[in-house]
Amino acid sequence: MAGRGGMVEWEVGRRRDSEDVIVLSPGPPARRRPPPVKAVEPESGGFAYEPPEKLFYKTRVCETFVTSGRCMFEDGCTFAHGDEELRPSLTACAGGWRKPSPSLSAAAPPVAVAPTPPPAQVVHELLARGSGSGGGGHRAITKVCFEFRDKGICYFGETCAFPHVSAAEIRQGSRLSSMSSSSWEMPARRSVAVTVPRTFVSVPPVAPPPPPPHYRVNNSSSYNAASMAAAAPAASDANLVAQQPPPEQGGRKMTRLEMLSLKKMTGIYGDWLEGYEHP
């Protein structure tokens, strides 16, 4: 009885283990926020700030979110998705980390920014710089940013190693480089110009038809002269057959294949002599 009761209890426990299974579905990931910046009081006076865990967290705008309107990282992206998520950047100083003072930034004189030259002038300067430096700037000159040329945007921005020039500006820059290269020439090579691929290539003119073959007749052989005389009317007959309208055979017009076979059979035996018998 004890053994049987133990077996029943084991079966009940086994059934309970197989039926009462609780599956917990993973919930949405918790949004992590940067730790608050702690203010400390240094020995020299004033207030300094300890650097947070992520120093540049949300200090720049996400370029992917700006261009496409969405980001695959969503809330976990380290860049700001909009101006409302931008955080003030921290600057390093001798006493520690501190936020830029608004009074200092307002009192600082504005920095004069040089006017941006037109794209064609930029390409012209790059071409001249690369040609004057020998082979050092050959890679940066002969290659442009394909993403900016084809799509009009580059994810690297100002840090891209290749110039951001469109297709129309490349053509204008190549014309400027060809004009400038004619004035002076390097001893080793001319200035390298940006090559523009051509989609259409000029088709060469159609070659004229070949002249008719010239037969060389040997006077010492009467057979060659007779064979050439017989071949001439046979060739003329073949041309006449080709120029004539398609004949009818059995109440129907002959196909082109039948006409070609007839023409071929006519020209095969054109060099045979009349009355000549094979020995």
UniProtKB/Swiss-Prot annotation:
Region Disordered: start-end pairs: 20-45
InterPro entries in the cross-refs: ZFP36-like (IPR045877), Znf_CCCH (IPR000571), Znf_CCCH_sf (IPR036855)
Pfam families: zf-CCCH
PROSITE patterns hit by this protein: ZF_C3H1
Chain positions of all zinc fingers (C3H1-type): 56-84, 139-167
Coiled coil, from the record: none
Molecular function (Gene Ontology), one example: mRNA binding
Transmembrane segments: none
SUPFAM superfamilies linked to this entry: CCCH zinc finger (SSF90229)
Keywords linked to the UniProt accession: DNA-binding, Metal-binding, Repeat, Zinc, Zinc-finger
Name listed for the protein in its UniProt record: Zinc finger CCCH domain-containing protein 1
Lineage, highest ranks first: Eukaryota, Viridiplantae, Streptophyta, Embryophyta, Tracheophyta
